[in-house]
Amino acid sequence: MIRDIGQSRVLFLDSGPLVRLLQMHPDFYPAVSGILDMAYEKNVQVLVSSVTLFEISSRAFENGEGVLARQYREFFEKSKNVCCCEVDAEVSVKAAELFAAASRTNHKITEAESLRLATAFVNGADCILTECANFRSLSDALVVTLDEV
């Protein structure tokens, strides 16, 4: 599956894999770190949603680590291959469409997940690294879950 990710030109990094990386989770850190190393080596554009920045920064502030939250922002804004994508009107409407489509199936997603998936869609991601297998039924992009890497 990592080989498939290596074919990507625009990789969307969802919240779950990023959180596992920051936690240095023993089961997932090596895989996520390896994927990011490969992305830098192959000059793959890595997208993250501003929703993800909100989610990880919230945790930092809850733990009294405001400096860490600002470091996350700095990383997203200054990293060469990483782009923090805003939730604008187009992303919001696409998220509403995805959320409604998912609610009509057994592949439910949360509002935050729909915003993140819409961010990937609107910004042209051809691969999504996530923990949410339900993204597969809602996206034409290659969806790779952490369990698969």
What are the roles of these predicted feature ranges?
Residues 1-48, 61-74, 133:
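Short, well-structured N-terminal submotif of metal-dependent ribonuclease cores
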Residues 47, 85, 144:
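General small-molecule cofactor/ligand-binding pocket signal
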Residues 2, 82-127:
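Active-site neighborhoods of divalent-metal-dependent phosphate/nucleic-acid chemistry enzymes
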Residues 1-10, 38, 82, 117-149:
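Acidic, PIN/NYN-like endoribonuclease modules and their adjacent C-terminal/linker elements
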Residues 15, 50, 89, 111-114, ...:
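Conserved glycosyltransferase catalytic-site signature
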Residues 63-67, 102-103, 144-148:
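Short, hinge-like loop/turn segments at secondary-structure boundaries
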